[in-house]
Amino acid sequence: PRALIAALEGEGVTVDALINNAGFAVPDRYRDTSWDVQRDFLQVLVTAPCELIQRLLPGMTARGYGRILNVASVAGLMPGAASHTLYGGAKAMLIKLSQSLNSEQKGTGVHVTALCPGFTYTEFHDVSGTREAMRRMPKLMWLKADGVAREGYDAVMKNRAICVPGAQYKTI
């Protein structure tokens, strides 16, 4: 994040919108996964979004305009489960961060939203090697990526701290 921000500043680029959407899956049990993999996971899902926000938020606040959309997950709102051990906790952290920042930034023109989708049709499950397991999920549990993106955009523009797309996930 530091090098990215330095490059943007060097080019005179002003950032008014940030979407933190990087991630990957660690589908094995915590005890069976090396610390290096777990550390990298936390770096991508927790540390990098926090650093990007920390570095960009002062400029957004000074300009009186900014939109920050943290792509979390409905998993961050549910109890923990075996495998993907850090995933729910990392996403819960993004949700709490978004809620806190949304509150802190009231009246500044900067909106912060946690987008919390459920299962969404993307290449994520192919890349993470979990596609076969996901095939067992009922089709009604799946969301289309464009609909999730639209709901997230609408939520951050309306300054909603949390957005849970899909009626099937709003009851969780």
Kindly give the residue locations of the regions a language model identified.
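Active-site helix of classical SDR
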Residues: 53, 89-90
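SDR active-site lid
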Residues: 102-168
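Residue(s) in the substrate-gating loop at a strand-loop-helix junction
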Residues: 73
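Active-site loop-to-helix junction immediately N-terminal to the catalytic Tyr of the SDR YXXXK motif
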Residues: 33, 80-86, 100
